[in-house]
Amino acid sequence: MTLPFQITVPGSSANLGPGFDSVGLAVNRYLTLTVTEGSEWHFSTQSADLVGIPSGKENLVYQVAEHVASQLEKTLPPCHVQMESNIPLARGLGSSAAAIVAGIELANQLLGQPLAAEDKVRFGSLWEGHPDNIAPSVYGGLVIGTHLSTETHVIHGGVPDLDLVLLVPKEELLTKKARGILPESLSYKEAVRGSSVSNVLVAALLKENWELVGEMMVRDVFHHPYRLGLVPHLQEVIRYVKEETEAYGAALSGAGPTMLCLSPKGRGEWVQKQLQKQYPQFEVDVLKPDDQGIQVHRVLSNQQQLPIG
């Protein structure tokens, strides 16, 4: 790959309630890497969301890229990487998965593009342990997947024709903490109920039955009940969204603390205004599903960008 080039990776919202560690949706918040030649590896940023990132080989993007290269028995040339992002860290919008996917794509480009999309998802899922954020960042749109010890399977479910309204708390919530509060096991009865709800969620998503999607989002048994104490107002927001707004439903975005609301197309700003008035302590944003996934462009001398692949 000829330097310089630019990699753009969307953020994502995982789970949509009961689709735990399996369902994810790409959103139009982005991590961008601008890659140029360098005498040694160096990472820099001007983004407020990335202040304090490691500038050398301890950077997650480099660590992932180097891992991919070592698995392919290749050596990466040193580069300067300018990182910019409007994906908030530790808020449940797939910031770490976006960095992992960016590292995989960085290695892919520097090594002559040997990886297919499914290879990227496999590398990313092995690193993170599940595909619910990785796969949407690779493919864009809605993705349903499962990650096994020997293989990772994902199905692309198209791009939902929805507005996404997000309530973003000021506080961070690290995924490690949010996972640490989950139980080691569920009873057989709870597992069956959780599985059936998740099955209906996926079927409703694929049939674009948004009212039913909203009903299933609030019936999760896998993580919502255990994370209520970590996310103030979660139960109240879910009830308010369902009963007082036009949105179909709400759920934690990933591990939280951001809360995701699915809104009819074109009505997101109206829902946003209602929620901002009701919950002034949160930042309330209207987003859309990303339909592209990873994008790579060659940066020309006049700063124009030429799509690759």
UniProtKB/Swiss-Prot annotation:
Its pathway is: Amino-acid biosynthesis; L-threonine biosynthesis; L-threonine from L-aspartate: step 4/5
Disulfide bond positions: none
Task: Give the GO cellular component terms, alphabetically.
Answer: cytoplasm
Record key words, sorted: Amino-acid biosynthesis, ATP-binding, Cytoplasm, Kinase, Nucleotide-binding, Threonine biosynthesis, Transferase
User: What NCBIfam families is this protein classified in?
Assistant: thrB (TIGR00191)
Matching Pfam families:
GHMP_kinases_C, GHMP_kinases_N
Major localization class: cytoplasm
Its source organism is: Halalkalibacterium halodurans (strain ATCC BAA-125 / DSM 18197 / FERM 7344 / JCM 9153 / C-125)
Q: What does this protein do?
A: Catalyzes the ATP-dependent phosphorylation of L-homoserine to L-homoserine phosphate.
Q: Where in the cell is it found?
A: Cytoplasm
User: What is the name of the protein in this document?
Assistant: Homoserine kinase
- The enzyme's E.C. designation: 2.7.1.39
Q: What Gene Ontology biological process does one annotation of this record name?
A: threonine biosynthetic process
Decide whether keyword Amino-acid biosynthesis is in the record: yes
What does it catalyze?
Answer: L-homoserine + ATP = O-phospho-L-homoserine + ADP + H(+)
Keyword Cytoplasm on entry: yes
Q: Which HAMAP family match?
A: Homoser_kinase (MF_00384)
Query: Which residues are recorded as binding ATP?
Result: P88, L89, A90, R91, G92, L93, G94, S95, S96, A97, A98
